[in-house]
Amino acid sequence: MRLIAAVLICISTSLQASIEAPGLSDREYRYLTLPNALKVLLISDPTTDKAAASMDVFVGTNNDPKEFPGLAHFLEHMLFLGTDQYPEAGEYQQFISDQAGSHNAFTAPEHTNYFFSLNPKALEPALDRFSRFFVAPTLDPAYVDREVNAVHSEYQSKLRDPARLSFEATKQGLNPNHPFSHFGAGNLSTLQKPGLLDALKRFYENEYSANRMALVVLGEEPLDRLEQIVTERFTEIPNRNLPSSIIDRPLFDTNRLPFVVQSKPATESRRLTLLFPVPDTDAFIDRAPLRYIGHLLGHEGEGSLLANLKARGYANGLSAGESLGMTESRSFSISVSLTPEGLTHRDTIIEEILRTIRLIETTGIDAWRFEELKVISDANFKFEEESDPQNVVTYLSEKLHSVPPQNLFTHGRLLEQFDHQLIQDMLSWLTPEQMLVRVTAPEIEPSETTTYYPTQIHRFPLEKNRLDAFQNARKEVSQIVRLPDPNPFIKAPGEPLPKTRKATIETQPRVLFFSEGALGYVLTENRYSQPKSDIYIRLRTPLASNSPEASIMSDLLSDAINEHLNSMSYAAALAGAGFSAQATQSGITLQFSGYHQSLIPLVNQVLDSLPIPLIDESTWSRLQQLKSQSLARVQAARPSSRLFDEITAELMPLAYSQTELNDAFESIDRQTFHQYQKAFFSGFKTEMFLHGPVSRDEGKALLESWVQRLPIDNSTPDIQVTTNPWSGESIRSYQYDHPDQAATVLYIDTNTDPGSRILNQLAGNLIEAPFYTRLRTEKQLGYITFATAFPLYNTPILTGAIQSPTANPDELADAIQNEFEGFAAMVEAMPDDQFESQRLSLLDQLLNPPSTQGELSNAIWSAIGLRRPFSDRMEQVATLESLTKDQFVAYLKQRIQNPVVLKAYHSNG
């Protein structure tokens, strides 16, 4: 069969030179259509640190048979459990893990996507395994019942998920005859039926076909070699010449509109969303009419719709743009995050939205506005860094079904032609007669509960008197909203910088500014060809986290800074110069990233705006509500996540439990916050880092000018960000409002040197796949099952976690500990080449630089904050280079046999 496939290469069709890629891409591309009609995109990148592949099947939950809702999702699970040439369940997962890789899949309404990434040297054997999913999966009956339970466990884990509950409510306002409105996740009641295996095989044979598939492969090999590897393996996929799987029914039943669906949220949040069906715009995507409209409606600058709603105390945020939709059925949405006051005035908000639409129709369709969007789109495309291999193959494999290969990268990205009439036509669809109104709020009084999720809703046709009022508003021009002026931050970013030879590239920042209370680092950008900078400024003070109250107020202060500067920073962000303030345990970090020419003026303006004015009552009320919602979201998170948060908080002296934070929040009023705000800005230490296209002298001058703008106080006590000492074994028990039970076990290494941290990472890489296979696939303890390594600051930790609908916490913890206690023996029995593959893969990651400028900046800033020497990385390289398997087994035995263990249990009572 391989020989036949190789011969068929000559009749494959290919396209190479005309694929337009982002300006900085050094990758080579080739599009093929194999003889079996499989669409293929090959990407050659000799310098990649990961190879990756994604197969997108143009089949999803929309194609489920009525008798078995969730069957497409169930098939996705089953394909991982053995093929004709690799029949052992878990073999594929183990192979990917052994090559320092990752894998996953997802089932969407129209698509099912399978993907992986791993060590580039292992791409060919990985594709050997991956291809058989689509040629000859075993669909082994022995795994059917077990995997139905896995699907059900996944379904149960998301029963309280806020996004899932809201989505379920939205579906109640859509066309009930469109399968998108139906249940697609699958559970015991929809799948555990007679005839499931036959239905599964029938679905695979009737829906999966090469002509419905698209494959993207990225590797270090030349294109000709990639073509040979792919053609030999994937030409064997059967082409059943199936017709298009697109559902030709409309997503919205226009006869039901206008319609209202109200729902109670899982957390304390309030949102108003208007959904309008609109025509498919793919034929004129380069004119971007909906993007243009969304840009004006969602603008956050002074005088904008959002700014006015905030000023009246009605809203916290607003977004607008193309939204819910299928291939041939689209929608446009305007979504407003409401305050309690805004909820009571939601009709007023709807009327003002409709008046703003009319304002755009009459005075807002301008060529210069389109040109602004075009300039920044062109710049972003020109200077886009190479995307993560796994992300790029997953993204492109779905697009291959509907986008000409030469436009894969430009589709929806580059703007070409201003079309006044087209924008006008799209605006004409945004009318109250064709509107689905979604309201989410705790105050809603429900009349029913949806079938598969505990979503409480109330739905009804929009009342005539309200429709009349909305129709009148749609004819009026807003008298309070002002459309944005020309953006002063939009500047031509220049040309790509010349790439520097590796031997001269700087990899460590230089301390170029040091004074009492201030420390500044500069790294000259000469690796990524970017006319961009990353700038970090930390306002360092114990007031950030020396009590639960301080921790809450530090969060509120960073929110207040973002709020006060939003009108300015939003315009800068549109121009590719981003800013945000974020609270940390050591202070508040001001982070800037973007085109250097636009970024430096932004930094100056932000620093000149500090300290911000004391906030007024209206702003305080909104910030309080947002913080309350944030705390509520933490409490609504799944048990496995909450346990991890609780247990890691115990390990950090400057972190606090959820109960402590909730109590602190309740004790803070505006006057207390004002006192905190004044104290914070009375003085602090600072540390800065500039990574960009500047010389050392230029960088030093900038740092000096920024320090002069800040109230530096060298007497401010310094902060040591570290972990609490721990010993022995400890158990913590919690009880949450969730039907599942959970356990998390942490193995804490008391050695914090660089070598111990990298050995911990290697241990996490080695245990991840077997832990998952035994406890998730074989024992079916729970859908959420994982083991991983992570450093908590400089402390190495191994953790295992399971969330289960059936087992109790003691059983889960015992299962986790049994896996870790057998870990050393497992590695000892492991073939030497398997261990070497993991060791060398991790070593390659250390030796290869980060793939983007932002990743390098973040890594350096993290090291600065943790007071890590920049030489740590080379110490870790030395540890791995000399490491033998016997030495690593001895390390594991010492670590696991004399453990420092912290356990956390959640019981549903």
List PLM regions with ranges.
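C-terminal regions of mature proteins
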Residues: 216-219, 369-526, 643-706, 719-726, ...
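Non-catalytic accessory/assembly modules
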Residues: 94, 125-127, 138-179, 190-198, ...
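N-terminal signal peptide c-region/cleavage motif recognized by signal peptidases
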Residues: 11-14
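Buried hydrophobic packing residues in well-ordered domains
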Residues: 37, 55, 73, 114, ...
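M16/insulysin-pitrilysin zinc metalloprotease superfamily fold
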Residues: 81-85, 117-148, 328-385, 542, ...
